[in-house]
Amino acid sequence: MASTSGVGSVGPASCCETQKPHTIRELCLAQQITYPCIQLCCHYCYKILSVLDIYAFDQSCLYLSWGEGGPTGICSQCTRVLARLEFTARHEVSCAASRLPHFIGQSLSDLEVRCVRCLALLQSVEKDYILREDLSVHRIGGIWRGTCVRCMVGLY
């Protein structure tokens, strides 16, 4: 499961790990390499991430996990499986986006929202679309989730 200390987290695990790169971009800068040259294994299935997996992980604003073997990411397939497992195990509530201010006192546009399918951090234009179409949003493990454009159109 995504947590504050592992793959898919939204922030550094602890103050003791501040010297380690948290993102793929930071790792590339630290190692003075580019995307096509970086090699990371998936934290869950141990396969080497493809260039597309690395790009998707970075664009999703997910953080690297550090272990004895170095940093790991998460491949696209495992990301989707993890998102489904989290929905099943940690789902708290769902509601229409327009009801959110009545429910929690905040608008969707004021919240950090991740994709329910691929865990990507939603951009403001995606949140605006969810609000305009009054789509469902879900609170899963304390994090609000909606569906990103890539998943809406079937690209991910």
From Swiss-Prot:
Against InterPro entries, the record matches this protein to:
E6, E6_sf
**Annotated localization:** Host cytoplasm; Host nucleus
Q: Cystine bridges: which residues?
A: none
Q: Is Transcription among the key words of this record?
A: yes
Zn finger regions (unnamed) covering which residues? Answer: 42-78, 115-151
Query: What does the sequence similarity comment in the record state about its family?
Result: Belongs to the papillomaviridae E6 protein family.
The identity of this protein, by name, is: Protein E6
Q: Which organism is it from?
A: Human papillomavirus type 41
